A protein has these predicted regions:
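Sec-dependent N-terminal signal peptides
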Residues: 3-14
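Intrinsically disordered, low-complexity segments enriched in small/polar residues
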Residues: 16-71, 77-118
Length: 118
């Protein structure tokens, strides 16, 4: 019986975790031109460029699909048309379904790069 169970487990295909969807609301004053997302603490960023159709500041939004296999904690790197970069470490994509850029933009004092952490 144990052997049959183990053989069945080997025969089952690996099932990928469903993706997480993150609604990004650009409430910052500058247009969002790209977002890069990586599993927290890694350099394995996957970038989505919006250069052809930027996500305009003031409330425009975009929804991105995030691979569900790497867990919940993600590092985000958002690049804006004016050259500024907003980095957010350990953002929980399981707990939060939306991200509002203006909340972190206001806290940054607006140097060229700002890093937030959850």
């Amino acid at each position: 019986m144990r052997t049959a169970y183990f053989a069945l487990m080997i025969a089952l295909p690996a099932v990928a975790a469903p993706p997480h969807y993150l609604d990004i609301y650009n409430t910052a004053p500058s247009s969002l031109v790209s977002i890069a997302i990586a599993p927290a603490g890694t350099a394995a960023f996957h970038e989505s460029s919006f250069a052809e159709q930027p996500v305009h500041g003031g409330g425009d939004s975009v929804t991105v699909a995030i691979d569900g296999d790497a867990g919940c904690a993600r590092d985000l790197r958002l690049s804006f048309a004016d050259g500024r970069v907003l980095e957010h470490k350990r953002f929980d994509v399981c707990k939060f379904r939306s991200y509002h850029t203006g909340r972190y933009w206001q806290r940054s004092g607006m140097g060229s790069t700002y890093t937030a952490q959850h």
